[in-house]
Amino acid sequence: MPTINQLVRKPRKSKVEKSDSPALNIGYNSHKKVHTKLAAPQKRGVATRVGTMTPKKPNSALRKFARVRLSNLIEVTAYIPGIGHNLQEHSVVLIRGGRVKDLPGVRYHIVRGALDTAGVTDRKQGRSKYGTKKPKA
């Protein structure tokens, strides 16, 4: 344990908080070709690869994912939520933060019902999370 004098000479360092979704905290000025510190809640990108991957140990499934090149030129892996999707290579998608616990390296979600991504069909409950319109009564 340090003495008061040691703390006066060299105070304690505060912990640096690390972002859960770092690609959303970087902007890009295409005019000057420089990265900026412009944070955003969502970002637009182009899907460069769409596929499935298997989750970590206790779970078993084929989870859908897309490799996305964002508007700030960073490439990330994003999860495609819901049952069924219409994404393919060169689809324009909107991503938000939020990791998938059993997929290593997947820190982003694709927003359903935005840009080229269609909402989940035949969904009755929790529709807003999956971009589904209200069914006709």
UniProtKB/Swiss-Prot annotation:
<comment type="function">
    <text>Interacts with and stabilizes bases of the 16S rRNA that are involved in tRNA selection in the A site and with the mRNA backbone. Located at the interface of the 30S and 50S subunits, it traverses the body of the 30S subunit contacting proteins on the other side and probably holding the rRNA structure together. The combined cluster of proteins S8, S12 and S17 appears to hold together the shoulder and platform of the 30S subunit.</text>
</comment>
<feature type="region of interest" description="Disordered">
    <location>
        <begin position="34"/>
        <end position="57"/>
    </location>
</feature>
<keyword id="KW-0699">rRNA-binding</keyword>
<dbReference type="GO" id="GO:0019843">
    <property type="term" value="F:rRNA binding"/>
</dbReference>
<dbReference type="InterPro" id="IPR012340">
    <property type="entry name" value="NA-bd_OB-fold"/>
</dbReference>
<dbReference type="Pfam" id="PF00164">
    <property type="entry name" value="Ribosom_S12_S23"/>
</dbReference>
<comment type="subunit">
    <text>Part of the 30S ribosomal subunit. Contacts proteins S8 and S17. May interact with IF1 in the 30S initiation complex.</text>
</comment>
<keyword id="KW-0820">tRNA-binding</keyword>
<dbReference type="GO" id="GO:0006412">
    <property type="term" value="P:translation"/>
</dbReference>
<comment type="similarity">
    <text>Belongs to the universal ribosomal protein uS12 family.</text>
</comment>
<protein>
    <recommendedName>
        <fullName>Small ribosomal subunit protein uS12</fullName>
    </recommendedName>
</protein>
<keyword id="KW-0687">Ribonucleoprotein</keyword>
<dbReference type="GO" id="GO:0000049">
    <property type="term" value="F:tRNA binding"/>
</dbReference>
<dbReference type="GO" id="GO:0003735">
    <property type="term" value="F:structural constituent of ribosome"/>
</dbReference>
<feature type="region of interest" description="Disordered">
    <location>
        <begin position="1"/>
        <end position="21"/>
    </location>
</feature>
<keyword id="KW-0694">RNA-binding</keyword>
<dbReference type="InterPro" id="IPR006032">
    <property type="entry name" value="Ribosomal_uS12"/>
</dbReference>
<dbReference type="InterPro" id="IPR005679">
    <property type="entry name" value="Ribosomal_uS12_bac"/>
</dbReference>
<keyword id="KW-0689">Ribosomal protein</keyword>
<dbReference type="GO" id="GO:0015935">
    <property type="term" value="C:small ribosomal subunit"/>
</dbReference>
<comment type="function">
    <text>With S4 and S5 plays an important role in translational accuracy.</text>
</comment>
